[in-house]
Amino acid sequence: MAKSKVVEKDKKNELDNQSADIELKGQSKNEESKGGKKKVIIVESPAKAKTIERILGNDYQVISSKGHIRDLPQKQFGVDLNSLKLDFEIIPGKESVVEQIKKMTSGKEVLLPSDQDREGEAIAWHLSTILGVKGKNIITFTEITERAIKEAVKNPREIDMNKVNAQLARRVLDRIVGYMISPLLWRIIKDARSAGRVQSAALKIICERERERYRFVPQKYFKVWIDIAGLKAYLTKVDGKKIKPTDITEEISKDVLQKVKSVRLVDIDVKEVRKNPPAPFITSTLQQDAASKLGFPVSKTMKIAQELYEGVDTKEGHTAFITYMRTDSTRVSDVAKEAAEKFILKNFGREYLNESSEVASKKGSKTKGKVQDAHECIRPVDVNITPEKAKELLDKDHHKLYELIWKRFIASQMSSAIYKQYSYDFESGKYVFEASIRERIFDGFEKVYTIDNEPSEKHKELKVDQEYLVEPKSAEAQTTPPDRYTEASLVKTLEMEGIGRPSTYATIIQTLLDRGYVVKKRKTLIPTILGFVVNHYLEQRFPDIVDKGFTAEMEKELDEVENGKKDWKEVVKSFLKEFNKDLERAKNEFFAIDFDTDITCEDCSGNYKLKVGKYGLYLHCPNCKTNKALKSDVFGVIDGNKLYVLEEQESQEENGEKNSVQSEESSANSGNRKFYRKRRTSGSKKSSTKSASSKAKKK
Ligand SMILES: [Zn+2]
């Protein structure tokens, strides 16, 4: 069982360090008084410290700072907007930790591991600044294994200030937006929590999808098909021209049903289709796959992945299982590639080996010695710890995620799956029906991992020119609006739009949920009315902040700071120049929340208005002057300047609950409670929403 959070403490040291709350192992008081070990490694987490200490043994003392130790002040702004001088302070509560670290490192060689990203580099920079250590004291690795750690301590490097600056710029931009906009937001919407830079762009994406769904007008169409020899052939052509399914009208359907009595098989088209193995996981794809296959929210995935990376207690000792989990690189190190190839050869055979991966690894060895992209994909640190073996070492959830990572990685190094695709064309007069099936003739990577659970269907031995008597069938269908986002599909969209980075996807979603701007129902993300109101305000007053293009551009500029192509202060200053204009206007111009709604007043025939008062959002009838509370379980869409309430309906599918375990996407689509827009009426019919109808005191 994994008990990563429980770190054994040396009793004696626990007494010594009680005040400092520092994890310290394997060092006796005697050693300390003699000067003890010469080299000290400071890491952020106790679990990581334990794994590294186990690897390096007696020459090193490994201590943990337990997360960040220095940041912008909690009670002041901390940024001089002219000079961009930053006023950092020790995070309250961390003073004693810092004192302890200072004591333990004085006169010793200090090594600071930096995860392969900006945040890790910044933490190392804060520490080295506080401790006053200079020179080559940064060590880097993407996995906490004996090979990687021993290699890392042999090759320390200097701090990469470009990386640190990119992180400082991000911190300052977020600080400016949060600190400047939030008070304005509170002035207008008392129960708004705050505004964040990247979350605001994500909120807008979610609100826009809801609006799109609301505006969506379903289109009726007909599915027309024939059943022949176990095949389902759909109408695909009329008069020699392809017809889109949604273009099949009732007229066409009726005509087919009336006229088509027999069809002739005119063509069988057979072609080979190769399904290529997926790339190994990066942060975003891991989050999506764990959501759809395991039903894990992204925050849970990241928490477990971090524990697997840092190391967990197992019956065979404290061990790390995977490489660093925040990455957008699919690169695989030569060592890992070789290990995977050996594993595949031994367990599956040569035909299962990805030919291109062999070529790639040979190429890779030629370029050895050259500086390479330091980042790597998310993969097992040892492919020989198979999911079966890991089952005995890990608890259920850790094992599930590890199994997914292991399978995806092995699959990425395997050969393509090969399918034969059979298309059967049946003709009757001007109509052509087509049936298509795929038969798998070689499983390849699908031996260990599936992308889409495609069934393999046996092809049918049919003869061209054969006539068949048929009874065409048809069913009415209608187009459906785009789905609401799930956590998985939102991460995919954020990545596609270039908003956020591997380290921020989980935080973005969590922040929107924590602030009550978005709620999660049946795994889908639904904007609340408060979320819509906040988004409306930001759209009106700070259009850049919620603009996905602008946010993506900022991310690119931060990348350029990291690559040394831009100065971080210039990036922040040019942002401030535009931002200040919006800020001045927002400060000086009156802004009121006053939306029309489609909710009918309970006391007269008028419609309520949505307003904001001392206690938050409420409904007001301008006709009879009564007020009603707006209940939190009411959902709606703000479109134009009007709030349209959505009605919750029970849907027919009863099996939504069962599906949710296997597939987030499928449960999102078949959940048994859905919100529908009210039928737009011509004005005479009015309905009041039940959920908004409880009486509230007048404000
Ligand atoms: Zn009224």
UniProtKB/Swiss-Prot annotation:
Origin species: Fervidobacterium islandicum
Gene Ontology biological-process annotations: DNA topological change
The protein, known as: DNA topoisomerase 1
Catalytic residues identified in the record: Y324 (o-(5'-phospho-dna)-tyrosine intermediate)
Ranges of biased composition (kind: Basic residues): 674-683
Residues forming coiled coils: none
Limits of the Topo IA-type catalytic domain: 160-583
Cofactor(s), names only, from the UniProt record: Mg(2+)
Chain intervals with Basic and acidic residues compositional bias: 1-15, 22-35
